[in-house]
Structures are given as C-alpha cells and as structure tokens.
C-alpha cells in the first residue's frame, strides 16, 4: 500500500503531516507527503473571518482527495468546517496536544501597557482580549508563523497570540505566557491533528491503527456543537471537551456579552444551548 499525504506547504502544516507519516511508516506503510498552497495562504490582505474562516485552508485539499490526486489530507482539526463533503470523513486523529493559547510577548497580558498592539485574526481571541483588556489595541495578523514572528520582531506588534500546540510543534523558544482556560476557552478541536479520507477507502483500516480514541471522542463532541448550531469555524466561540465534560463560551456578535455553558458531553442539549444564545446574532 502506498499513501499520498496531502497538506498545506507551510512549515507547521508540513511538520504535522510528517507526524502522521512517521506513524504510518512505523506500521510499514509506504508514504509520501505532498505540499500545496491553499486559497487562504494566498489572500493575506483580508481578515480570515471575512474570506470564509479557517475552512479556506481545508477545502482545496479535500477536493484533491475527491479528484484522486491525494489519498488523505492532514489538517489542524480546528480548521475543518462543521460540514464536509458527504463522501469524506475524519478517519483518524492523533493524540491531542495542549489546546490552550499562548501570548508571545515580553510582557504578560496583565502587564501590557495601555494601547499595546496585539496581533490575531481570530474573532474568538479578539473577543477574549477585549473582555480582559479593553485598553489594548488589536490588529489583524495573517501569514505563516515565521511571518508573524518577523512582524513581531519588526515592532509591528507588542505581542501575538497563537495556539500552544503550534508553538510546541514549531519548537519556538521565545518569552511567552500560557493563557488559562478560564479566560481563553480554546477553539473547538484546537491542538488536534486530523486526517480526512474517503469514507469507502481501504486506507481507513490502516488509519484506525494510529487513531487516538479519547481525542477522537472529544473532537466529535466539540464538532457536534458546531454542526448542531451551524456555527462554522469563524464564530467567536470557545469549546473544549475533557473527561466527559464539555465547556463552552459563546460571545455575542452584537455586544460584549458572553455566556458560559458546561455539560456532560454524552448528553449535549442543543436546544438548551440554542435558547441560551438566541439573541447573540449567530
């Protein structure tokens, strides 16, 4: 068996694809990694949420699976839209890495001076920042991680926010501050590397051997909220499943309000959640 692994060509995406390749190689499977540039990598002038959210990083690769140009696609699970083509599935995930966010800066969030400039393109992070520090400035930040760090070094920003999992996978060594769960509820599926394939592919039997069951169940619970409420990838929502509990934070699109909800993730009540956020503009 020979498996063609598709991924974005960014350094982080290639690292994640190689993590999957290494696990398949350990099973004696012949693999190759193919890197591609996505629409989201080309359009760096617009805020991410204005061009379709993180799903723009996923769609092109998924189409390549359907065209038989690649066999599987490796994605950051948080980038995968709530709904994908009916003939595709998330067939496996690797064990979840730290789902929290980090602030890369010389100063902690509490110690930043007023009017400090923080870079992020995430509506969730923007809302979280404004809730905690409405005296700082938030500036859109796009590009791969090396580009973002260069902009930080050039003085365009006083700090930037990124996923702790990405920070660790890239082996970045900079002064940083981990943002706790209470203040920054992680994005749904943050820290999870997911593999998409055709539902009827014989490759899926192999992929099951590298799947982490606990992470897969957490991923499904978080995605159930996204799909059940038709939230998509770009809404200001934090969702984190852990040890059979699911923690949710919904930020209003109309004002600075937010709602925290906690449930047993084996008994998710979508109607209750919908009633709690009915006037949030989703």
Swiss-Prot record:
A biological process from GO: protoporphyrinogen IX biosynthetic process
Keyword terms of this UniProt record: Porphyrin biosynthesis, Transferase
Catalysed reactions listed for this entry: 4 porphobilinogen + H2O = hydroxymethylbilane + 4 NH4(+)
GO cellular component: cytoplasm
Cofactor: dipyrromethane
Enzyme nomenclature, EC number: 2.5.1.61
Modified residues (S-(dipyrrolylmethanemethyl)cysteine): 233
Co-factor binding details: Binds 1 dipyrromethane group covalently.
Enzyme class: transferase
Keyword Transferase: yes
Pfam families hit by this protein: Porphobil_deam (PF01379)
Record-linked PANTHER family: PORPHOBILINOGEN DEAMINASE
General remark: The porphobilinogen subunits are added to the dipyrromethane group.
Protein family: Belongs to the HMBS family.
General function of this protein: Tetrapolymerization of the monopyrrole PBG into the hydroxymethylbilane pre-uroporphyrinogen in several discrete steps.
The name this protein goes by in its record: Probable porphobilinogen deaminase
